[in-house]
Each structure stands twice: as C-alpha cells, then as structure tokens.
C-alpha cells in the first residue's frame, strides 16, 4: 500500500516528494507533482482536470459538472453567481516556503460588473502534498449603493462527473453508498432536494441507509465536523481505492460558532463558507465589506487498498489550525486579508463548572453579541475548545482582538458569558471563572435535556432500526413518519411517568403533513400539547413565585431561514403560548422573524436557539394534578415558494418548572 494510514499532525498530506512544476499558456495553468496533476481553465476560473496517480477524479466536463474545486455564491442582486463568469484574470505565483518546500498558487480575480463586487479565489499546491489549500475573498466598495444585500451563500465545490465515486461520508453515522444512476433516474421528489427511492428497492443506498435521499441528511454541526467527502471502493477502478475530502483545518472565518450546521457532501463535496440553511445569520454586504475566508484543504488520497475509514482518518489527521501554519505565513504576502501568526495570540482558561455539566465547551466570538449572531460583525473571528474534566481549556492561533467568552454544557440550563476578553498578538490571555448555574428556586421538574437539541425526543437521535447502517431518525426526512400513528390523541405527557423518547415528539407542528404516504394534513391534534404534573402540599408550602423556562433548539416562523420580515404573513413573528391550569392569559414567547430557522424540514434537531423565562404567581398552581398547555396557532401556516411544508413549528430543547 502506497500510503500509511496513521498520520501525525506534522505529517504531509501524502508521500509525494518529486519537485512541483507549474506551466502556463494563454488558456490554462497546470500544477503537477509526481502524484497530483491539475489543469486550471483560465477562461472559466475553475480546475477542469484532476488526476491522482493517473486516475481521473473529475470525469468529463458537462455544464457545471466535472469541474472543481471552484467558487460560487448567492450574493448578487439576481442571486447566484460563479466566480470567473464575467472577466476572469488569473495570476500564477511560485515560491519556496519557510520550511524549504516549493509551492505554486493560482489566484483568480473577477469583478461582477453590475455591482462592482470583487471575487478572489486561491488554490495553492505544495510539493509533497496531494491537495489544494483554498482561500476565498469577497469585497464590495460602492458608496453609491452602500447596502447591497446579504451574503446568503458562499461556497466552494468539488463537482465530479464520473462513476469512480461509490460512497459519501460526513461521519461514522453518516456514511452510505451513493444512489445509483438508476435510482436517481427513477426517484420521486417529495420535498425540496429530497427524493424517495422506492422505485429501486434493490439500490445499495435504499437497502443500507434509507428509502429517502436528501443532501440535508449529511449536514453536520461545525463543532463535530472536521472532514467530509467521497470514497471510491475500487469497484469501478480495478480494485484501487481513493478518497476526496474537504478538510476543515481552520474554522475561524466561518460564522455561527460551533452550533452552525450545514451541507457537506451529496455527490458534490462542499465547503459552505457562509449560508443560512438552518437559520444561522449571514453578514450584510455593505460598502467596505472585505473578507477573506479560509484556509481549508481539499485532499485527494488513496492509490492502494485502504478502506474508507483509513483514508478519512488520514484526512482527519490534518484538521488542526496548527497544521501548515508556517506555510500559511509564507504565502500571506499573496493572500489579501489572511492574518499571519505574528498577529495572533492564545487563550488558556479554567472554568469551575456546575455539577453534572457534560460535554462543556468554551467559545470565543465577537464581543457584545450572542455567539450564534457573530455574522453581525462580518470581520469577526471565532474559536472554541472542549473543556476537560478539570475545567481547563486552551485555544491557540487566536486573531488579536476583543472577544466574548461563552461556556455551555449538556445538562445545564442557560450559558455562562463574559465580554471583554482581550487577546494580544504573540501573548497568552489567562481566564479563571466560576459558572454559577441560573436558578429560580427549587426545581420541581424538567422535561428534556438542555443540550441545544431536540434529539432526545421521538424521531430525533434514535437510530433507525429498519436499515443496517441505522442512521439517526431525524436525518432521514420528517415525512418518513406518521403523526396520526405515533400520537393519535396528540401529545399528553405526564411528568414522572411518560417517556420523552416515545411520548414527546422532536418537533411541535402547528399542522402535520401532507406526507408521501398520507395526503391529508392533520391540525386537530398537533397545535396544542399537554404536559401534566402533580404537586404536593409540601412542594407548594410557602411558595410565592413560580418560574417556567422554555428553551427551543429551533423554531420556524413564516420567514423560514431567511430572516426577512413579510408584513403579509400573520406568523412573521410566531407566538408560542403557555397556559397554566385554568388561567386565561398565557405566558407568551414570540419567536422573531430573525430567530426563525428551517430545522427539522432540513433534517436537523439543533438550529438557532431561542429561550424564554417567565415568573408567575405560585397561586396559579394547585395541590394534585396540574396542566401546562403549549399552544401554537391553529392551522398556523405560511406561503412556501419551494416544495416544503407550510406549517410553522417549534423544536423543544428542554423545559423546567421552579418554585420559590
């Protein structure tokens, strides 16, 4: 086997050692070492041929397939734009980095004439590696039109057109055979970008993974996602296996923090640099906007008989901000806006955590803003690190500046935040804090686990028992399940007796359906949910104030994932009303149009977080049986231009009742 499978972070991305060459003519640039050869089309602004050990990784060009990696966006007034489509100007740069390693880079410059938006895309190949270091830049300088629009999507794509690739993977749980050409030809569209494959029941994807295929099935949180890509098992390449991967070796120029989730791979390998698929905020493109994103690394490996897991592990071994940091410093002179090591510091901290805090994480984002809203400051950077059992964490290579520290953990309501964390270049900032969990008295009950996810409830993270790869149920497609069969009488949950995994749904619909198997939408049993609980005289004795906390892992108002207010929609801002016993006036949470997310309909159980706490008189409660009724608008729907469910909905993270 030509490749080792256990690589240290200091290891190169392959064992290639021959000198790198770069040749240019009027129409193309070719970058090549002894294993990897790439041809760049100067007129198109994209790589059009890519070979590893003589194996074609892209296949023939056909429209927008058989090319990549390349850059496009949804960011012009008319929508989509592919960098290089107007007047591509390319530059070839070459040099030797601080380690004595040769490199060559292609820089694409393109200006979208109607607005003056400037695009730059960078591809760098180092000698001894079989992949491309990628940076992307968007700039907008226009005093006449100081506000253009939001940067709704910015992404790079590796888009093959070949039967070489047999599997796609974004995690151990999200690994599957690619649907066959026959399955794709015979598929039935059931939702935007979602197919039913029951016309080809012998297809490997159908047999092993799911009856439904959607690009959203392979989306992931950025906290959990380091590498994703395609695998060739050798069945179409004479027994030789290959991999193509997007390695997220840095994440500091994305937005949304560790809870940002996005598409990864669906036959195309994406690097979704900016998007709002699951409701995350996106930056506005205003006069002076100038942002360089990256680096990330597209790795191409294989050439022997390595398994998918082995090739993926090789890619994952490179997913560290320290990998190739010296190289990035060497090429900073070529990359406008890249922040070199000389302008970065580090943070080390100790947090005394609440009892029973699980999977704690420390997050650094822009000062003064909720961490999921850091796109409000487009120039901001973001970092995070797991906190160990002793409460310690460390984060290196932090761009100098002022940050907010956020700490959260599974099992704990609320977050710890501290503004004003100053990071200085080439200095280490120390933090020592105590996180005192929020409390409004004695906890009477909680429903769900506060972990910023609705996955613990029915059809959430539970594994699908009907397919041998057993994907989590929420990843498959919401319409694969039937509300009327699961909850014929609606939700009637008894604290202390009911099981959250079966008796509480992962999503609270105002209206459920229609689905592929049931053309009738259900609203009578969906919009009102009942939670019953008993209280004793002892629990109520001398209590004056009760506090109800509701944390949502996601919610969809009429704005969906767009953050656009539409006055014609009655649920542009969505009310969730909580009624206590016989009280006629509810405790009302209003989910704003800019807090809405397309969560479960895009196969997610953790999106933009929304929470509310209410104090109310303890006299509203009584000894014996009590009722909390959670109510969404009856028949609450909105207009959808795409093939998506029209219902508004919420997804509960956790609820809690306290008394004092």
Swiss-Prot record:
GO terms for cellular component: extracellular region. The keyword Cell wall biogenesis/degradation applies. Its main location: secreted. Gene3D superfamilies: 2.70.98.10, Carboxypeptidase-like, regulatory domain (2.60.40.1120), Galactose-binding domain-like (2.60.120.260). Pfam families: CBM-like, fn3_3. Transmembrane segments: none annotated. One of its GO terms (biological process) is cell wall organization. InterPro entries: Carb-bd-like_fold, Gal_mutarotase_sf_dom, Galactose-bd-like_sf, GH-type_carb-bd, Polysacch_Lyase_4, RG-lyase_II, RG-lyase_III. Residues 446-466 are annotated as: Disordered. It comes from the Eukaryota. Glycans are attached at residues 25, 109, 142, 284, 524, 566, 635. It catalyses: Endotype eliminative cleavage of L-alpha-rhamnopyranosyl-(1->4)-alpha-D-galactopyranosyluronic acid bonds of rhamnogalacturonan I domains in ramified hairy regions of pectin leaving L-rhamnopyranose at the reducing end and 4-deoxy-4,5-unsaturated D-galactopyranosyluronic acid at the non-reducing end. The keyword Glycoprotein applies. Keywords: Carbohydrate metabolism, Cell wall biogenesis/degradation, Glycoprotein, Lyase, Polysaccharide degradation, Secreted, Signal. One of its GO terms (molecular function) is rhamnogalacturonan endolyase activity. Residues 453-466 have a biased composition (Basic and acidic residues). Pectinolytic enzymes consist of four classes of enzymes: pectin lyase, polygalacturonase, pectin methylesterase and rhamnogalacturonase. Degrades the rhamnogalacturonan I (RG-I) backbone of pectin. Active against linseed rhamnogalacturonan. Belongs to the polysaccharide lyase 4 family. This is Rhamnogalacturonate lyase B. It comes from Emericella nidulans (strain FGSC A4 / ATCC 38163 / CBS 112.46 / NRRL 194 / M139) (Aspergillus nidulans). The gene is rglB.
